[in-house]
Amino acid sequence: MTKKQAIKRKVKEPEPTNEQSSASEPSDNEEDDDLLQAVKDPGEDTTDDEGIDQEYQSDSSEDLEFESDEEGNYLGRKANNEAEGDAEEDEDDDEEEDEDSDEASEDNDDAEEEKPSSSMTAAVQTKVEPIIQIIPRDPSKPEYEDSDTSDEEDIRNTVGNIPMHWYDEYKHIGYDWDAKKIVKPPKGDQIDDFLRKIEDPNFWRTVKDPQTGQEVLLTDEDIALIKRVNSGRIPNAEHDEYAPWIEWFTSEVEKMPIKNVPDHKRSFLPSVSEKKKVSRMVHALKMGWMKTTEEVEREKQKKRGPKFYMLWETDTGRESMRRIHDPVSAPKRDLPGHAESYNPPPEYLFDEKETKEWLKQKDEPHKRKLHFMPQKFKSLREVPAYSRYLRERFLRCLDLYLCPRAKRVKLNIDAEYLIPKLPSPRDLQPFPTVESLVYRGHTDLVRSVSVEPKGEYMASGSDDKTVKIWEIATGRCIRTIETNDVVRCVAWCPNAKLSIIAVATGSRLLLINPKVGDKLLIKKTDDLLAASPSLDVIDNERIKTAVQWSNAEPEEQEKGVRVVITHFKPIRQVTWHGRGDYLATVMPEGANRSALIHQLSKRRSQIPFSKSKGLIQCVLFHPVKPCFFVATQHNIRIYDLVKQELIKKLLTNSKWISGMSIHPKGDNLLVSTYDKKMLWFDLDLSTKPYQTMRLHRNAVRSVAFHLRYPLFASGSDDQAVIVSHGMVYNDLLQNPLIVPLKKLQTHEKRDEFGVLDVSWHPVQPWVFSTGADCTIRLYT
């Protein structure tokens, strides 16, 4: 039997008492006794001086064998010689260890309880490695019960960490692991909560789970944990916060040298190599080969030269430095022209009109085209001395030494670069391009035209004192209504439920039922206009003297005239409100009563302004807001009819305003002037024109926006109707797009008049124009 088998059997057998062990198992030889002293008793403490359990194992997977030398010291070495012989024995030993592992563990525990005495040192013992016992996990308990991980939480609601108030409007509160809705539990009212407070003894420890909405009963451990947290103590009651401190690592810094080798004896003797080096340097100094530091500095100073320097780079540039840098020569005077000759051609001499204009600008000489008046002499000897010679020489000297001179780089900018890039007109269709119909029947100037809201009929007014109703599709004149004066303006009511035409003729405003279209609509209009006015409204004297309401005479009733509103001055313009109940008239000669607002349903009139801010040309209602636009000769004022105050004043910078039209959205205004301009105002942007368009050669008399398409048209005395694209975007950061599309010029000019009015079809992209040639033209 080998030594290892004997040691293992010693471990397996129960350990006897001290007396029995010493008597029954005497040591066989001295080697076994020394082996017991070398091997540490497994019953002793296996911790090091720091308190950490130490597990003694072999240096490698092979076994260690202990031998003793002559002095009794035991050495461990690998059993290389007996590796083959012990291989079979090791296999048997492993089988025996597996069978008797339980008995060995019990014997090991007994050995720890009873330490061997001195008599037991003779017994052969062996070092037994500690056996690690794996305790199986209880499946009924969570794997991470005592840890902080959240992977094993009992999560019923799988919505995640989101605000649960997102589910307040739903009947469910989330989804379970089967993707089914978790229905909210029924909620009680305040009475149920009050009864639970009284009857339920566990009400105070019941909380609501926000994930599932269920009520959870807190255990005693939960309540104790909450109390400890509220009191500021450690949540775990088993934790000892005053446990003795174990200093696993020392806090004392031990300063020890890296090497502690004593100095050599030759380190105390002077260096021989340094002695030779110094002797060579002394010899070089004596021979002049080596220079001292002072000599080196003196040589460097000689190489640097003197410290003073020249004020200028070169002697030749001294004079140029004294002068002005880059002098600019004085501009030369303009050479005399033909007008300054003593005998100029006749076309350069002033006539009486030019002479008066030149003398009129005496106080503003800078506005004169020439600073002198050309004169003609027969011969050079007749030319007198120049009277302005000294003054011009003096002004020239002032310009030379008082006016600063500078060189300006001339920018060569291509003209095409300044022109904005506009889309092609082909991409902006549809818009009218050709003349389709010509409506003939009037015998004098056709001043105004208006289209029915449905787009089937059209009304026109002329200087021949007639109003004509036209069928648009066929060009046939359905009815002609004669008036007693020149028709300045006609306006069809924009309300499609009424069939009314407002005609301004002289100082009378006629409300006419044209009797075209639906018969029920015609009857409804007659019933509305035949209703007697209310008597509870009392007009003041100022209104009574300005306007009077009356029913039409029987002769006019047959023509279709229903109501006559008589004004105290000639009417120039009439316009409707978008709902068709209010209409406004303009009398330029009416001073502070130039503009009047009439209400059709109550048959009453109002004077909105008590003072005249200028000669009113035209008025306009806002399509959406309760605002009123009033255009004078130079400016446009916007009033709030509800608050009765001025909102904004638009500056046109023009001589005379002829008309205006507002965009259907109400944010942009188009103004026409007699000085050949069209002004586009962005009401949200500024009080000054956003864009000024000079498309016509003569006065622009009328402008109009289309109700549906991004189109607007203008008519001028140059017999042209110009159709343009005007897109207004909902994005406030994007400017309107204005593109001229087509110039339609088919009217004839008579008495310096051309196109007098333009109007759009309410549905189709068609435009109507009236002219001085007594015609109405349709462009499609």
Curated annotation (Swiss-Prot):
It holds the Pfam family BOP1NT. Residues 1-155 are annotated as: Disordered. WD repeats lie at residues 441-482, 484-522, 566-608, 611-649, 652-691, 695-734, 750-780. This is Ribosome biogenesis protein BOP1 homolog. It is found in: Nucleus, Nucleolus; Nucleus, Nucleoplasm. Required for maturation of ribosomal RNAs and formation of the large ribosomal subunit. Keywords: Nucleus, Repeat, Ribosome biogenesis, rRNA processing, WD repeat. GO terms for molecular function: ribonucleoprotein complex binding. PANTHER family: RIBOSOME BIOGENESIS PROTEIN BOP1 (PTHR17605:SF0), RIBOSOME BIOGENESIS PROTEIN BOP1 BLOCK OF PROLIFERATION 1 PROTEIN (PTHR17605).
